[in-house]
Amino acid sequence: MVVSDNAQLVNFREICSGSIAPGMLYRSSHPIKDNKQEKIISMLANKARIAAVINLCDFNSGIYSKAFFAPWYNRLLKNRLVIALGMDFSVTSNSFKRKLKKALKFIINTKGPWLIHCHAGIYRTGFVCMVLESFMGAALDEVINDYLLSFNSIFESSIYATQKADSQAAMRILSVMSESMTINEQNLKQIAETYLQKTIGLSVKEIELLKNKLSGTY
């Protein structure tokens, strides 16, 4: 099995659409499952030189016992380079918005490459990545296709196989950023930036810092 197949197995891939710098941002499923490290993710994370992790699914109270099983992850955690946010699945909830702001400020205040993950690397990770890709100027079809790619992954178990996703479903999720405005190729980037400023609450300065971090110009 080649590395690309292994990466697909655990939903590990680079995000390099729009002006996101090569080798700067990655996504995956959880690096530690059932008290065992995912060896494929460990290998790929080391190869990518992951320097900080945004964990969308665990709480601080649980991540320390898990991290013990993955030395690279545990090292980052001890150096305060892992943020555990315990996000729910409701991307419109106030709790989700507050935690997304924490995730973005974590990126601003750390150095990449960054890895974003939840449990399966599909829903919560998918939404956060759509926001960042849109914000950094990715084409609409790139954003949608990246979200859907996780559903086509070999990683999908029977649990996820029953939850079919298509481009219309992805657009509905993406439209969370736009409120009542229809998203299109021309307004996607501006909608994402407005969402980060007005809904998530980043300042103008923080938005510029986030752009610089993701584009590798900091």
Annotate the PLM regions.
Residues 1-115, 127-218:
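Cys-dependent protein tyrosine phosphatase-like superfamily
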Residues 120, 124-125:
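Ser/Thr-glycine-rich phosphate-binding loops at phosphate-binding pockets of nucleotides
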